[in-house]
Amino acid sequence: MKLVIAEKPSVAQSLAAVIGATARKDGYLEGNGWRVSWCVGHLAGLADADSYDPKYAKWRYDDLPILPEHWQMVVGKDKKKQFDILKKLMNAPDVTEVVNACDAGREGELIFRSVYELAGCQKPMKRLWISSMEDSAIREGFANLCPGADYDGLRDAALCRAKADWLVGINATRLFSVLYHRTLNIGRVMSPTLALIVQREAEIDTFKPVPFYTVALELPGLTVSGERMADKAAAEQLKEACQGAAATIKKVECKEKSEKPPALYDLTTLQRDANRLLGFTAQQTLDYLQSLYEKKLCTYPRTDSRYLTGDMADSLPVLVNLVANAMPFRKGIAITCDPQTVINDKKVTDHHAVIPTRNLKDADLSALPAGEKAVLELVALRLLCAVAQPHIYSETVVIAACAGGEFTAKGKTVKHPGWKALEDAYRAKMKDAEPKKEGAEKALPELTEGQTLSVSAAIVKEGKSSPPQHFTEDTLLSAMETAGKDDMPEDAERKGLGTPATRAGILEKLVSAGFLERKKNRKTVQLLPSHDAVSLITVLPEQLQSPLLTAEWEYRLGEIERGQLAPEEFLDGISTMLKDLVGTYQVIKGTEYLFTPPREVVGKCPRCGGEVAELQKGFFCQNDSCKFAIWKNNKWWAAKKKQPTKAVVSALLNDGRVRVTGLYSEKTGKTYDATVVLEDDGQYANFKLEFDQRKGGSR
């Protein structure tokens, strides 16, 4: 009997159906000499700090850094049942071999190995490594199982990544939280990513636009423009000199150009396009693509390759043809297929590029959720474009002279639309399709050098230099991918911050931690740092916010994966860095109050409708332009020997009144009960008393 362990139940069912394990049991499937079970994501993970010593349950500076000598793995309480099932299956006497069928990547390897080792399993181990959930790919994968030991480097890299994240997260988070009296989540990749965003905002805030001026001349059939000028008076002078004059054509240059088709998608480029064209977050795109993979409609999602392998060349034309027939936007467009444009064995590591599968032929695409359908169409479009003919056009550049100045015009004539015909057809069907820029592909009239043309109009156009753009998920993913790239070795397989598999999760963590806000601006969603994010990057030392250092770590993890670096050497370097950080870092003078304490909202402001929150000295509207406040040392309340509590103020804001007991009377020296009513006159928050007339009110 052979045991197969998948990463999740849905994948296990697909595998079991192909190999004939169809009988349902408690936590697994069985049949045809196979048992198929599953993990539920990470069943086991690194233990919390207090597992090593109970004193670590409390965050104290004196306990740092926390550097475990012997790492512990623990099973999550909510996942113990499935772990126990796997442990029993692994150690069953009739099981002769265990097949790791978790996702074919770092995390999938770690998920399986953690369970395998915690279960104390000693059975021979094989690895199922597939890039598609199609039945044919599954059958081929089981026919070519690899020895599990071939992936020891992948396991080592995954475990080192987890330990590095633990070390930096636990120690840096505790250090800065203790020093600044606020929980500040710090991550090995998260913090440098945040630093990119904060730095961009600083560049935008300090940017000073520089005005410039260009002179444009209207000639018969075309408009020519001069170079940018810093002096407006000089531009006006040139305009006047050109007005009513004649322009001489100095140069006419026509070149035929070719624009190659785009490469296929890896995960990051797909996430970027899905954000730019569809408005999806990186996490949404990954989730949709993962579902399409499990539905056997797309290949493996977490890939960093944009090419296919040579053994796929012969079957590619058939796939391209059936994909084209399934996509409505390609109607009327001739489909070509040049496999060599997408074949490159040297640029495929663990998995090839993301492409649709042949199951598309029989799939009911209308039954797919809208998000999945949109991502599938994008993947299909890219495949059709990538194997299509180049986009060929002629570009004409005209240089004219007038009144001592030079003026230029460019024109474009499409000779063969090639792959762009598909892209244009796809975009034309989009609801928010961007209109083509007027004149962007306008052809110029026939002109000859030495020809003179009359200037019918001359104008001065004023512009300003543009500030850097706020990050979107599209542009941030690009920045993460290339961070530290120039300083990495040319042959480095992984450069940048994070990996295709982890970048979406990093962005979501930044949002959930309150460091990052998604703000819609017209058709895009900008990523903006919060006040606390700016404060955090202000106090973080360079080694925790440097994209270069983190990119270097990613490169080192790649070396571990390839067996070129010992895991201990990598982790020793991080431990040394943390010891130095704890031993030398001091609170930066003037930054003690950068981090505002969390403010609990108690109600709505009666003046502006904003949120009223409790601070140390009272309850204040959070809108900067509104001055509504209820002070805790308010004289009216002090005279009655009471202080407005959170519950009292909440009732006043929500209901306008609140019943209060034990109010003190200065006249009688006794206490009484009454209803306090809030009366706000727009300048001050006033209070009055109301008494129950039926019962009276003794003072």
What are these regions (language model features)?
Residues K2-L3, K79, M90, L118, ...:
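Basic, low-complexity terminal or inter-domain segments flanking catalytic cores
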Residues P9-A16, G33-V36, V40, G76-K87, ...:
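Amphipathic alpha-helical transducer elements in NTP-driven molecular machines
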Residues P93, D135-L219, C254-S258:
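C-terminal or mid-to-C-terminal helical accessory/interaction module adjacent to the motor/catalytic core
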Residues A23-Y28, K123, G148-G153, R174-V178, ...:
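Active-site phosphate-binding and catalytic loops of NTP-dependent enzymes
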Residues M1-L3, A101-A104, H181-T183, C254-A263, ...:
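Conserved short loop/turn motifs at secondary-structure junctions
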Residues M1-A162, P467:
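Intrinsically disordered, low-complexity regulatory segments
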Residues A233-Y265, Q271:
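Metal- or metallocofactor-binding catalytic centers and their adjacent structured scaffolds
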